[in-house]
Amino acid sequence: MTPGQWLFQAQQLHPETLALQGPQALTHAQLFDESLRLAQLLKRQGIRQQQLMAVQLDSSWQLALLLYAALQLGVRFLPLDPGMDNARRQKLLSLVGCDYLITEQSAVEPGLQVITLSQLIDQSVSANVNFHAEPLEAENIQLLIATSGTTGDPKGVMLTAANLMASAAASEDRLGLAAGDSWLACLPLFHIGGLSILLRCLAVGARVLLQEGFDAKGVWEQIAKGAVTHISLVPAMLDRLLRQAGDQPPHAALRVVLIGGGPLSGLLAERAHAAGWPLCVSYGMSETASQFATDASPDAGLLPGLVGLPLQGYEVAIAADGRIRVRGEAVMAGYANPEGESGKGLEQGWFETGDLGHLDAQGRLTVTGRADDLLVSGGKNIHPVEVEGRLMRCPGISSVGVTGREDPVWGMVLVALYTGALTPEALKGWVTENLPTHLRPRDYIQIDQLPLNQMGKLSRGALKNRLLQADKGDG
């Protein structure tokens, strides 16, 4: 059953249970009707099956409704970061062959039609009983996701309906999602980590509790009253949530705290476990339709980089150079390209993640970091994630990022930029006592805030620029 058919199935099996809760609360029957109504409006604007519709909106609620409408109409869907600048947007939309763009305000985009949100909202149209849904077939491209890199040319990841079906089934198998559960969604919906929540819940008839951005107080209130069974967070969000909760245990209804989007420090994992938070540490990306490995064991997160066994339908291998490769039913059809060819970015079905890692005797995957981030100092390969994890165990350190500075003797020396009350001198003294020589940074720079992207993940390019500025005396 394809994602477009999930809407019909959910309203048949669970018509009166809540499907989507945000500014409004919609049952599965109401969501089916509303998505069908929006699909009619989109069709009146000229949008047809298998055309590509990009959506760039501030409102997660409106974006979610348009996704469901796209499923009904059989339209390919591309959610865009509302902060994406015009030049980058034009380049991406040209690359992927976009037909329509839905935005808050009118815009000029060569070669495609722009529809403002008001044009859809202003049309008060009831669902036409003669209008029939036109869901895509399993092999059709259903979703495109813009890669989240902040540098370089944007790419569009092509995911078929079959990819999304396999991903939802694999997640359900590992995490135990079922009808009646409630997944709090506070990640951006233009990222696969956020958007996949909508699809997983739709597949089984669960509820999505949708928040506009991450508000630790609001999230904790929902968890504390037992309204949440599942939640997806990045490590920075988990830290803020634990602080908001005062390191109290969550309500017993919460069964899964899915962590992804970057490495989870052992110290943060220990805090969460001590307070009784049910962590599941995951690893995945847009190209794999979200998570493809997840550690759901009772001690998840306590071993650095361990992300557990691959999910059903995925095969993981380690290349000779240590890079992680993955293939399977949910791995993308390829990167969008003007020729419309599938398989771009894949090698005989394998996708190379660009991350380094290893598999243990049990088949569990450990991720050590990005291959491109590897630093070579004095002939030794050092990954900054390992150093950062150790530095975070120092009392008085709130956050830390490690980067490299070119050196005529060592090739590269490590530099730590950190936040916290500890002085650089005191931190250096702690490091001397606790870290082996090759993992010790040469310098320590205290800053007000680490550069993070919208997912709360350390931006290593921006961190490098901060170091260059500091070396020039610019702060």
What do these predicted regions represent?
Residues 27-29, 142-169:
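Conserved AMP-binding A3 loop
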Residues 306-313, 319-348, 380-382:
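Conserved ATP/PPi-binding loop(s) of AMP-dependent carboxylate-activating enzymes
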Residues 16-46, 54-60, 68, 85-90, ...:
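Conserved AMP-binding/adenylate-forming core of the ANL superfamily
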Residues 436-458:
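AMP-binding/adenylate-forming catalytic domain of the ANL superfamily
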